[in-house]
Amino acid sequence: MNRLTELIREDMKPALGVTEPGAIAFAAAKARSYTNGAVLSVIVRLNSGMYKNAFTCGIPNSREVGSEFAAALGVIAGNWELGLEALSDVRQEDIESAERLVEQGKVQVVLQNISSRIFIEVVVKTDEDEAVVTIEDTHTNITSVVVNGEEKFIHSEKKKKGGKPGEKQLIHTYTLRQLCEYIDNENVSELEFMWEAYRMNLELFEAGLSSERTTFVKHLLKKNGGVVFSEEEQKTASLLCSGAIEARVLGLDKPAMSITGSGAHGIIATLPLYAAYKVNGYSKEQLLRATALSYLICMYIKEYSGKLSAFCGCAIAAGTGMACGLVYLRGGTVKMMEGAINNMAGSITGMICDGGNQGCTMKGIVAVDAAYQSAELAMDEVCVANVHGIVRSEERRVGK
């Protein structure tokens, strides 16, 4: 298997709700699995990016939000074996028990450090045991488990993205041209696994469309003539994207296929391309190849920014990947993709991330609009030149 194909396959993961509270629930459930007796306290220590992203996130299978409730529900009813879908089997009585745990002041969330590097530490103390679970770098990568003072070593996830600290990440050893050569030449049968992302993300969209709790998607449905797939590609793309993201941040009971540890990234990198595929009649093979490119560009950017950065990676990283995917579907050149990247970087890079919340829906709509404009301008050879602003670069690896 091509190592880029393997990289995508490893990075794609189902995630129920926003990935940050999902990771907190996973860690809490894992810690609880090592303890017996009644829960006395739960302490959650987070890096700043994790703290920010989970602050007002909707928690799957409930109407609650935030890190405290994610940890409480993880302790009460989480199944750590399900990873980022740890809360998929929650019942109403579990929600009520978690609410009592929070109301009694038994759950405490602490800001551990200022960093874009993922860090979660959950301490579960009962009247019989104490367990400490630590996660670092990726959302489910357990690096340490300590039970009643005894350290247990847990094998970390194998990562093909790079080697030793400071070593160039695998994705950064490729130029944009080389990524496109891979896209053009990889056997399409090796890319079939990505179809699962469309199945999963479209089911999430349908959940958002049918939910009484969503608002943005219903407005965009009206703007799209009351149908999901209209002849207006961009409106269809915005509709699909917003519906899935809104469902996700509300915590509706359907997973997204995440990329770079984010369900919203996975949605933005895929569903607008599906709109283009349906409206314009592109082949499934074209869609899969465009999706692989979209994913890789997103991953390339995220390896620079960090998984939990201060800027909106959904719009900037996934949106840029999607813009390149649109150029690819339309038969554009590598130079045109460079132009689309410049247009995205020169326009929406200033968008901040204020955590996983309803605002992500609006950011997704903005990302679609910017990506379509960036791709269309680049196809007409109109782009922000390398001498200007944040786009300026003495020597750029991508595109050479």
Model-derived segments and their meaning:
Residues 228-231, 235, 248-282:
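Membrane-embedded translocation segments of transport machinery
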Residues 396-399:
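Conserved small/polar residues in nucleotide/adenosyl-binding loops
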Residues 40-83, 95-107, 286-336, 340, ...:
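A structural-propensity feature for long, helix-poor, extended segments
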Residues 14-30, 254-271, 313-317:
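Conserved phosphate/anionic-ligand binding catalytic regions in large, soluble enzymes, centered on
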Residues 3-16, 178-181:
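Generic N-terminal amphipathic, Lys/Arg-enriched alpha-helix
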Residues 38-42, 82-87, 108-111, 189-195, ...:
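Flexible, glycine/charged-enriched surface loops at secondary-structure junctions
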Residues 103-251:
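Signature of multi-pass transmembrane helix bundles
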Residues 21-37, 266-282, 323-331:
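Alpha-helical support elements that line or immediately flank enzyme active sites
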